[in-house]
């Protein structure tokens, strides 16, 4: 099994990205999810994402890729790179805020906020966007995607592929608006570069 995964790692990574970006949404927009409460709907979304991330983790471990990006070594330079990435991310958001209209993803979230109450509010105000979401995204779009594209590393394909897929992730459910894509791709590019220079999944998270 490990040899098969290593041999078809790129193909498996593509399938997992498709599952993360499209199959989950198909399930959540099917009749199966029609009768769910808000909390059950968002929890199902999170659990389905967790399942994809778990599969990605298993694939990375069995292929030997995880061992290469699992370094917990602390370096002052990594802390400095993280600070630069955070600064670049803040500047990017500031610039795009004035250059581009609000993204449809952001508008949809703002419209949903008043409906969040009780456990749903905790899930969608804090746990998912602050804790689970960043971990899920980095595991898939930095860990899985960039290790799958590492053969194109010298041409920057790992960074560009990760950033592009990260951008698509955030717009595919709300309409394909080019400015929205650039907003999210820019953020993905920053975290992809941070992952590249630190060689660790933990710093981007």
Model-flagged regions — what are they?
Residues 136-161, 190-203:
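Membrane-interface helix/loop boundary segments of multi-pass membrane proteins
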Residues 19-25, 160, 179-205:
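Functionally important transmembrane alpha-helices
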Residues 43-55, 119, 123, 127, ...:
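Membrane-embedded alpha-helical segments of multi-pass membrane proteins
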Residues 34-41, 65-133:
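Juxtamembrane helix-loop-helix connectors linking adjacent transmembrane helices
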Residues 7-63:
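Alpha-helical transmembrane segments in multi-pass membrane proteins
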Residues 170-178:
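Membrane-interface helix caps and helix-loop-helix hairpins in membrane proteins
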Residues 6-21, 81-89, 159-163:
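Alpha-helical transmembrane segments
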């Amino acid at each position: 099994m490990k040899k098969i995964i290593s041999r078809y790692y790129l193909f498996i990574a593509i399938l997992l990205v498709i599952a993360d970006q499209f199959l989950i949404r198909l399930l959540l927009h099917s009749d199966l999810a029609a009768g769910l409460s808000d909390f059950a709907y968002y929890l199902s979304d999170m659990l389905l994402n967790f399942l994809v991330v778990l599969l990605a983790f298993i694939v990375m471990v069995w292929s030997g890729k995880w061992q290469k990006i699992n370094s917990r070594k602390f370096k002052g330079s990594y802390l400095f790179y993280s600070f630069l990435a955070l600064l670049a991310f803040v500047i990017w958001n500031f610039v795009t805020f004035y250059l581009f209209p609000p993204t449809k993803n952001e508008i949809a979230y703002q419209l949903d906020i008043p409906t969040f109450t009780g456990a749903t509010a905790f899930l969608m105000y804090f746990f998912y966007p602050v804790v689970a979401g960043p971990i899920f995204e980095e595991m898939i779009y930095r860990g899985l995607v960039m290790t799958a594209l590492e053969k194109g590393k010298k041409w920057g394909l790992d960074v560009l592929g990760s950033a592009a897929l990260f951008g698509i992730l955030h717009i595919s459910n709300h309409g394909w608006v080019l400015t929205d894509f650039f907003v999210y791709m820019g953020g993905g590019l920053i975290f992809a570069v941070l992952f590249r220079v630190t060689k660790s999944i933990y710093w981007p998270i």
